[in-house]
Regions:
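Alpha-helical transmembrane segments of multi-pass membrane proteins
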Residues: 5-12, 172-175, 199, 236-243
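Alpha-helical transmembrane bundle and helix-membrane interface signal
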Residues: 2-73, 85-92, 187-189, 246, ...
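Loop-to-helix entry and N-terminal half of a specific, functionally important transmembrane alpha helix
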Residues: 182-222
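Hydrophobic, glycine- and aromatic-enriched re-entrant/interface helices and adjoining loop segments
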Residues: 38-164, 191
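Interfacial segments of multi-pass membrane proteins
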Residues: 6, 11-27, 140-163, 226, ...
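Hydrophobic alpha-helical transmembrane segments
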Residues: 162-178
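A juxtamembrane structural motif centered on a specific transmembrane helix
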Residues: 211-257
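Transmembrane alpha-helix boundary/anchor motif
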Residues: 80-83, 92, 96, 173-180, ...
Length: 257
């Protein structure tokens, strides 16, 4: 499914740490940008923008034939990709995925269907203000206006009950955990332990970022839990096992020859 594909896709960050060229990240960013912009505006306008950008780069590169050849190849590939966006969107994505993306991009306004969860989540977070309404005092969450408020949309519960301050504290706690994991990964003596540590940090970072993005309408709803906080035994066990395997590896690092 889409959620699993995105989770495994985050391992590109681990490969980047291990020496994979940063061009892959640049290409990936360009693909996502072209996909979104082609959904928003006519593909002919997108092609026009690509040609103008390429022409400007041609001018600045002047007589460097190698760079010009690379740029021309990228222009051809990008133009071909633009024409495949509609087919990909209409024939590969599931109907509910398409509807969520359209709601996210503002092409549809479905406050009683695909956009209901995000709309109610925004109301809950916004109504929390600076300090929140207090523990178990949130109206949107207390009266079940927000579906899945204890799993995928649990951040809106935190935002409504504890406000901006509580939300920022949660972000700080996760950032501290991630930086600590990266620091521990860097001091590992074996490649496997280091890669595993970065993998754990990447998975937690991705889940945290996408979960928050879902609740405030920055990314499509794809059903990803908030690590260690969302309700559900399987999620909690999975993240706990991931983390404690790495802690065991770190504790045993000095025993490696």
């Amino acid at each position: 499914d889409t959620g699993s594909a995105l989770v495994y896709g985050i391992f590109i960050l681990v490969l980047f740490r291990e020496g994979v060229t940063g061009n892959i990240l640049i290409i990936g960013t360009m693909v996502v940008f072209l996909f979104i912009i082609t959904l928003l505006i006519n593909k002919l306008y997108v092609l026009g923008i690509l040609v103008l950008v390429a022409a400007a780069l041609f001018y600045f590169m002047k007589r460097n034939s190698r760079n010009i050849l690379v740029l021309l190849s990228m222009l051809i590939i990008s133009s071909g990709f633009v024409f495949t966006v509609d087919y990909t969107f209409e024939n590969i994505l599931e109907p509910h995925h398409k509807k969520r993306i359209n709601v996210l991009l503002g092409k549809e306004l479905d406050l009683r269907g695909a956009g209901y969860n995000v709309h109610q989540s925004k109301i809950a977070i916004g109504s929390g203000g600076i300090t929140g309404k207090g523990f178990l005092q949130g109206t949107q969450t207390k009266y079940d206006f927000v579906p899945e408020q204890d799993t995928d949309f649990i951040f809106c519960t935190i935002g409504e009950e504890w406000g901006y301050i509580g939300s920022i504290l949660l972000v700080i706690l996760f950032m501290a955990l991630l930086f600590r994991l990266i620091k521990l990964a860097e001091r590992q003596r074996s490649d496997f332990s280091r890669i595993y540590g970065y993998g754990v940090a990447s998975i937690i970072f991705f889940h945290f970022t996408v979960n928050l993005g879902m609740t405030i309408g920055l990314v499509p709803v794809i059903g990803i839990p908030l690590p260690f906080i969302s309700y559900g035994g399987s999620s909690l066990w999975a993240f706990t096992i991931l983390l404690f395997i790495f802690i065991k590896q770190d504790a045993s690092r000095l025993q490696l020859l």
